[in-house]
């Protein structure tokens, strides 16, 4: 789904829908209060957000896993496998599973560390622990009360913040921001803070970890090159901006709904457009796993990684949960 414009800036429509948003936020709070938490035998780091889609949870989770692995700690990812049919608990096998089975995010995470798909998260946590996980990194699930979290990081896009600040359907928030931040241990802000997020973090007494998304090494080859870009992610404009940052010349850009299952017709039409413009067809790593397998080699990818402004700020957070990293 594409976010309506009024999710970014308050207007008459969002105000009209505000009572429904209040009910939604109340339901989230009630479910959390009534939930019976399962506490795994190992620490759980939740990488979540308050708004729907596009905050940057996956790069944050990958960055955390890489730091833990470098310190000799064995992290496992736990995800519900959004967009896939797998109920789990199931360990993701990159040789056997595709996005239709386990979801696109699980395929990206599994390149970095063992990854479990489980609709009922406690079952996935048990499986991960039995298979040697020393830390569980939970992808999303900040509003899920079925599993106890030892460290909760709320990921926020610096330019979007919490949109108009209202709860769905009146705004992009899964719950009122103040309600969510009251449970958070830290806020991760990706990109320049244009929404007063530092002040909000201070008001809630939590640290702010600033970070930015850095284009992968393949970006160096894009300078001056004509490209036709497409993406089906939460905020495709961020991907298009990254291409321009690399010096690419965007002949066209196409936005698809988040998690869009690309058809052969979709990609063949885009390939034809790129050929007609003597341009390179390019997408994101997350989108690539949803392309027809035999067409992937014809589509370039610009990857991104997370770069912390002050990596040392992670140390006290890890110390708090007894992890040396």
UniProtKB/Swiss-Prot annotation:
SUPFAM superfamilies found in the cross-reference section: P-loop containing nucleoside triphosphate hydrolases (SSF52540)
Short name of one Pfam family: LpxK
InterPro entries: LpxK, P-loop_NTPase
Pathway(s) served: Glycolipid biosynthesis; lipid IV(A) biosynthesis; lipid IV(A) from (3R)-3-hydroxytetradecanoyl-[acyl-carrier-protein] and UDP-N-acetyl-alpha-D-glucosamine: step 6/6
Keywords, alphabetical: ATP-binding, Kinase, Lipid A biosynthesis, Lipid biosynthesis, Lipid metabolism, Nucleotide-binding, Transferase
Catalytic reaction(s) noted: a lipid A disaccharide + ATP = a lipid IVA + ADP + H(+)
A GO CC annotation given for this chain: plasma membrane
The UniProt record lists the keyword ATP-binding: yes
Sample GO molecular function, one term: ATP binding
EC number: 2.7.1.130
Annotated residues for binding of ATP: 51-58
Single Gene Ontology BP annotation: lipopolysaccharide core region biosynthetic process
Function statement: Transfers the gamma-phosphate of ATP to the 4'-position of a tetraacyldisaccharide 1-phosphate intermediate (termed DS-1-P) to form tetraacyldisaccharide 1,4'-bis-phosphate (lipid IVA).
Family recorded in the similarity comment: Belongs to the LpxK family.
Protein name: Tetraacyldisaccharide 4'-kinase
The organism's taxonomic lineage, starting at the top: Bacteria, Pseudomonadati, Pseudomonadota, Alphaproteobacteria, Rhodospirillales
């Amino acid at each position: 789904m594409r976010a309506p414009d009024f999710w970014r800036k308050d207007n008459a429509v969002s105000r009209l829908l505000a009572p429904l948003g209040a009910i939604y936020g109340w339901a989230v709070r009630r479910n959390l209060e009534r939930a019976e938490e399962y506490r795994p035998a190992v620490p759980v780091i939740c990488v979540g957000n308050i708004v729907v889609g596009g905050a940057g949870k996956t790069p944050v989770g990958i960055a955390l896993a890489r730091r833990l692995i470098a310190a000799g700690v064995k992290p496992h990812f736990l995800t519900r496998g959004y967009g896939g049919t797998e109920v789990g608990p199931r360990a993701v096998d990159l040789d056997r599973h595709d996005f239709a089975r386990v979801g696109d995010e699980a395929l990206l995470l599994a390149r970095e560390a063992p990854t479990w798909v489980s609709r009922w998260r406690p079952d996935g946590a048990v499986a991960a622990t039995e298979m040697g996980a020393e830390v569980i990194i939970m992808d999303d699930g900040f509003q899920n009360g079925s599993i106890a979290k030892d460290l909760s990081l709320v990921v926020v896009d610096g330019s979007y913040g919490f949109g108009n600040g209202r709860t769905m359907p009146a705004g992009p928030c899964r719950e009122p921001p103040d309600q969510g931040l009251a449970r958070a241990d830290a806020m991760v802000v990706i990109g320049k803070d244009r929404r007063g997020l530092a002040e909000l973090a201070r008001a809630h007494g939590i640290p702010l970890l600033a970070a930015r998304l850095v284009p992968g090494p393949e970006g160096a080859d894009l300078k001056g090159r004509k490209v036709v870009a497409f993406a089906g992610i939460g905020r495709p404009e961020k991907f298009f901006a990254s291409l321009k940052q690399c010096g690419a010349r965007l002949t066209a850009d196409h936005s698809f709904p988040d998690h869009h299952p690309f058809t052969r017709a979709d990609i063949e039409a885009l390939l034809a457009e790129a050929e007609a413009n003597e341009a390179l067809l390019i997408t994101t790593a997350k989108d690539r796993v949803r392309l027809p397998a035999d067409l992937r080699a014809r589509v370039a990818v610009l990857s991104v990684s997370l770069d912390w402004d002050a990596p040392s700020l992670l140390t006290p957070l890890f110390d708090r949960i007894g992890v040396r990293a």
